[in-house]
């Protein structure tokens, strides 16, 4: 038996296998370089401050959170994303707290609205809350509202305010604060309103 011939054959097969592995690796490397992974959240800077409003989870009333800066940029349900201010969701009481499964419709009672401020640029802000309507439960008044101002990084609770809204169309001032150079926040005494000062109808609807 010519054992050298078999050794030569096995060596040739090993060489072909190694070449195949090498070409496969080079192909995968070239594919990765041609299609680089997109930078995460390159289009959406992280939040620096959060304004969080919550009210009775079982309430059917529609309460709205509004913010206005010193450049007259107004963010609320009509204009949800403007000047690095973003309202995450227009909570309508229990009317949009539902989701559908294969079996039925589930209700998750959470009444909460959050506005993100995605910049530490020096600006001054006014925050208000507005009783839009109580169509879901005409007798459900008054409404106890809690509003928090949080700094995200480093995490700090800057202010917590509780107000009571008694009837639809009522608006209450929550706080007036200013972001200074470097990110420090100071508060001002004020009773400025947004909706009742500007007129809700004058704020145009803007798609996100």
Ranges and model annotations:
Residues 10, 18, 37-38:
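N-terminal alpha-helical membrane-insertion module
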Residues 9, 13, 191-192:
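A subset of signal/propeptide-processing and intrinsically disordered low-complexity segments
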Residues 1-11:
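N-terminal Lys/Arg-rich, disordered targeting/topogenic segments
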Residues 24-208:
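Intrinsic-disorder/low-complexity signal
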Residues 12, 16, 62:
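Calcium-binding loop positions in Ca2+-binding modules
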Residues 16-20, 24:
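Sec-dependent signal peptide hydrophobic core
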């Amino acid at each position: 038996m010519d054992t050298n011939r078999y050794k030569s054959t096995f060596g040739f097969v090993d060489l072909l296998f190694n070449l195949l592995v090498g070409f496969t690796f080079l192909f995968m490397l070239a594919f990765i370089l041609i299609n680089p992974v997109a930078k995460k959240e390159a289009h959406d800077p992280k939040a620096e401050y959060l304004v969080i409003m919550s009210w009775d989870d079982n309430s059917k009333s529609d309460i709205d959170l509004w913010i206005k800066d010193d450049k007259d940029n107004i963010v609320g349900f009509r204009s949800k994303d403007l000047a690095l201010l973003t309202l995450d969701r227009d909570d309508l009481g229990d009317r949009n707290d539902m989701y559908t499964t294969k079996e039925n419709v589930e209700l998750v009672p959470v009444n909460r609205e959050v506005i993100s401020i995605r910049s530490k640029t020096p600006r001054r802000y006014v925050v208000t809350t507005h009783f839009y309507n109580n169509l879901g439960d005409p007798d459900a008044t008054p409404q106890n509202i809690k509003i928090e101002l949080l700094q995200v990084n480093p995490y700090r609770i800057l202010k917590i305010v509780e107000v009571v809204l008694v009837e639809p169309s009522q608006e209450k001032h929550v706080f007036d604060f200013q972001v200074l150079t470097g990110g420090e926040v100071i508060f001002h005494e004020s009773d400025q309103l947004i909706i009742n000062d500007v007129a809700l109808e004058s704020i145009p609807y803007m798609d996100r």
